[in-house]
Amino acid sequence: MQHLALRATQALSILAIGWLAPAGVAMAEYHYSPQYETCMDKVDLGALKNSQWAACADQELKKVDAALNTYYRKLQQQLEPEQREALKKSQRAWLQYREARCSFEALGPVAPGGAASQSLCMLEMTAQKADYLRDLLP
């Protein structure tokens, strides 16, 4: 049940980002792996649920981060030098923002809090960025 509430919170975050996106920008949703879905479904909702959620998210983050890096490299190869430099600058700024935001979520009033919030934030933001880079590819 809490897994569903957590997924609803993630979905609302994605919807909010969609409303903020400029008109005409396609917002595809990242599809998490079946292993991640299975891991989240197996979380025991007892006292250790937050560490289990964090472990699932951390494991999936490795896959999503690899996809993001693949899209980034492919896009870099297709850009002009000035565009490549702008993309690199943008990516560096985004990495700093992601770290700061997810560190805040670990400390902030957002449920579930702690390492689980930080891991889930990292996963969600990385998936969104991977989608963005993928959608820029021809």
What label would you give each PLM region?
Residues 2-13, 19:
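Bacterial N-terminal signal peptides that target proteins for export
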Residues 24-138:
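N-terminal alpha-helical modules
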Residues 17-25:
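C-terminal segment of classical bacterial N-terminal signal peptides
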